[in-house]
Design a protein with these regions (language model features):
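N-terminal helix-turn-helix DNA-binding core of bacterial DNA-binding proteins
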Residues: 30-72, 83, 99
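Pre-recognition alpha-helix immediately N-terminal to the DNA-recognition helix
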Residues: 26, 46-52, 108, 135
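Charged, amphipathic alpha-helical coiled-coil/dimerization segments
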Residues: 78-136
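Alpha-helical linker/hinge and terminal dimerization helices associated
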Residues: 27, 31-34, 66, 109, ...
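N-terminal leader segment of winged-helix/HTH proteins
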Residues: 1-42, 126, 146
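Exposed, interaction-prone assembly regions rather than primary DNA-binding/catalytic cores
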Residues: 135-150
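Short, locally clustered residues in the helix-turn-helix/winged-helix DNA-binding domain
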Residues: 49-53, 114, 142
């Protein structure tokens, strides 16, 4: 679907969905590579980011939030803990659980990665889009965000 066509028919919406999927995949690939040289798997980056956003979480809560198996999340978190990026603390009311949170180094690394991604994206927006296109993008952001709200 070209930028000049308007959505309306099921075929137009399907074409738009396909183009958006491709563009989103390419954008994510670029953002993942813009980590300022930080060596981290995508699952490690997501877990670190979720802990930075949502604060201390149990393995089960983190796995549920990211829609992965607890065993997979345990493996990811073990690597982050070995690297000194997350810390463990007992749950205040349930002694069977452990809460994980960012260490100071994890917070520093997460901030560094976010800045690198935002710098790349800001540069791409200002160098590749006209002012009118930038306005259109800004207008579309809430619409895109609403597509992924739970």
């Amino acid at each position: 679907m070209s930028a000049t066509r308007k959505a309306g028919s099921a075929a137009d919406v399907a074409a738009a969905a396909s183009e958006l999927r491709v563009a989103a995949s390419r954008l994510l690939r670029h953002l993942r590579s813009a980590r300022a040289g930080i060596e981290m798997t995508p699952s490690q980056a997501v877990a670190l980011s979720r802990l930075g956003t949502d604060g201390p979480l149990s393995v089960a809560d983190l796995a549920r939030a990211e829609r992965v198996r607890p065993q997979s999340m345990r493996t990811t978190l073990a690597t982050l803990e070995e690297r000194g990026l997350v810390t463990r603390a007992p749950h205040p009311t349930d002694q069977r659980q452990v809460l994980l949170s960012l260490s100071d180094e994890g917070r520093r690394l997460l901030t560094l990665a976010h800045h690198a991604k935002e710098d790349w994206l800001a540069t791409a927006i200002t160098t590749k889009l006209s002012p009118a296109e930038q306005d259109s993008l800004i207008t579309a952001i809430p619409l895109l965000a609403s597509l992924v709200e739970d």
